[in-house]
Swiss-Prot record:
Enzyme class of the recorded protein, top EC level: hydrolase
Name by which UniProt lists this protein: Thrombin-like enzyme agkihpin-1
A Pfam family hit: Trypsin
Family named by the database record: Belongs to the peptidase S1 family. Snake venom subfamily.
Species lineage: Eukaryota, Metazoa, Chordata, Craniata, Vertebrata
Length: 237
């Protein structure tokens, strides 16, 4: 869920993809070139269908396209990930897509993000912190990039490490957040694709409980190696 937000403009999320299983939209993802989508490892399911160029779930765009995964790549062959590490998955589409009015890739970041940046996150996730209410069109919200400790301190039960390849983002006073169904979607800071929605509190958007995002910049070498055909590439330790 994107909470405390507004409906996205139909033209501002050409890179956003929707992951379906059967008829259920369960995660988002980001098109990074004509053949590859980046999302969260915990979004891995059997029989994924990928919709590109989608805005309304009820009224299709003329240029919507559907794909299925040709290959999936994880940091570890075991597909393991934790709350603080390796929640990232690369999906190779079964055939390339063409740019269109509502489809275009989002570039990988050229520099790391800075704490204090205003970031935008996008998704079709729940729009109520307590009710199973899902929107027809994706919602967008601006949140702040925070110190990692801001995500570590509120969750002592998770025993998160002192350092992490995870970004922390949210609004400390609460009210704005990603939520159930937004996993795998992008966090865009100062125009750059910096994070993949990973996990947060439930109920969402609670004060002093921001959410965590996989840090894309730290995984650039792995992403670029996999795309180049070096399928034995390893993620950063």
């Amino acid at each position: 869920m994107i909470l405390g937000d507004d409906e996205c403009n139909i033209n501002e999320h050409r890179f956003l993809v929707a992951l379906y299983t059967s008829r259920t939209l369960f995660c988002g993802g980001t098109l990074i070139n004509q053949e590859w989508v980046l999302t969260a490892a915990h979004c891995n399911m059997e029989d994924i269908q990928i919709k590109l160029g989608m805005h309304s779930k009820k009224v299709p765009n003329e240029d919507e396209q559907k794909r299925v995964p040709k290959e999936k790549f994880f940091c570890l062959s075991s597909k393991n990930y934790t709350l603080w590490d390796k929640d990232i998955m690369l999906i190779r589409l079964d055939s390339p897509v063409k740019n269109s009015a509502h489809i275009a890739p989002l570039s990988l970041p050229s520099s790391p993000p800075s704490v204090g940046s205003v970031c935008r996150t996008i998704g079709w996730g729940r729009i109520s912190s307590t009710k199973e209410t899902y929107p027809d069109v994706p919602h967008c919200v601006n949140i702040n990039l925070l110190e990692y400790e801001m995500c570590r301190a509120p969750y002592p039960e998770f025993e998160l490490p002192a350092t992490s390849r995870t970004l922390c983002a949210g609004i400390l006073e609460g009210g704005k957040d990603t939520c159930v169904g937004d996993s795998g979607g992008p966090l865009i800071c100062n125009g750059q694709f910096q994070g993949i929605a990973s996990w947060g509190d439930d109920p969402c958007a609670q004060p002093h409980k921001p959410a965590a995002y996989t840090k894309v910049f730290d995984h650039l070498d792995w992403i670029e190696n996999i795309i180049a055909g070096n399928t034995d590439a390893s993620c950063p330790p």
